[in-house]
């Protein structure tokens, strides 16, 4: 018996297999499953899940590398951060830290302190998607540094369900808030 769930039905397929295990009943055959049948189903399900996880990890790393390249567009001397919003394996928005449109592209004052009106990469990407015909609801945000508290509020309100980041910022209150809101946070330190 081969299990080949589609990506769309993966969760419901997993749930029905688990339900079958719990009831020891296969609705297709209308007889109890033997231990060997259960083990076979479990092994096939595990193989599908492992393959999906490996593909997801590969895509996560690729999108993070894209966010890192996008960060190079920032004029900030102190820290360059890039962000990409992905939905259904399509990039729907991007952003990098910098000044608002129409301002000079200088992020720091003469003493090297970041100007107060500089936007973070996440905020730039979220506001960009808000002005488009796309929706960030259910999407994934890839960002080169973990979000701050203010950006985390925007992430929650925009409907983003997953945040993948490269560098862990020393202040973790943003990540803590995202986790409290039920948003999956994935730290990939090595690309």
Walk through the language-model features, giving the residues of each.
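Zinc-dependent deaminase catalytic domain
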Residues: 32-191
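Residue-level signal for mature regions of secreted extracellular proteins and peptides
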Residues: 2-4, 141
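Acidic, Ala/Val/Gly-enriched low-complexity intrinsically disordered segments
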Residues: 8, 17-20, 24, 30, ...
């Amino acid at each position: 018996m081969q299990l080949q769930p589609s990506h769309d039905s993966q969760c419901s397929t997993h749930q029905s297999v688990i339900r079958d295990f719990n009831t020891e009943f296969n609705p297709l055959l209308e007889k109890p499953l033997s231990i060997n049948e259960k083990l076979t189903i479990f092994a096939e399900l595990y193989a599908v899940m492992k393959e999906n996880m490996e593909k997801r990890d590969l895509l996560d790393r690729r999108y993070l590398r894209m966010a890192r390249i996008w960060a190079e567009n920032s004029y900030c001397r102190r820290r360059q951060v890039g962000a990409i919003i992905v939905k259904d394996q399509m990039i729907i928005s991007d952003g990098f830290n910098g000044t608002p449109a129409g301002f000079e592209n200088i992020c720091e004052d003469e003493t090297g302190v970041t100007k107060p009106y500089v936007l973070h990469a996440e905020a730039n990407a979220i506001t960009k998607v808000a002005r488009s015909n796309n929706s960030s609801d259910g999407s994934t945000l890839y960002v080169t540094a973990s979000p701050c508290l203010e950006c985390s509020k925007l992430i929650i309100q925009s409907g983003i369900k997953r945040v993948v980041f490269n560098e862990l910022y020393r202040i973790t209150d943003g990540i803590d808030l995202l986790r409290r809101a039920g948003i999956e946070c994935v730290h990939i330190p090595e690309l």
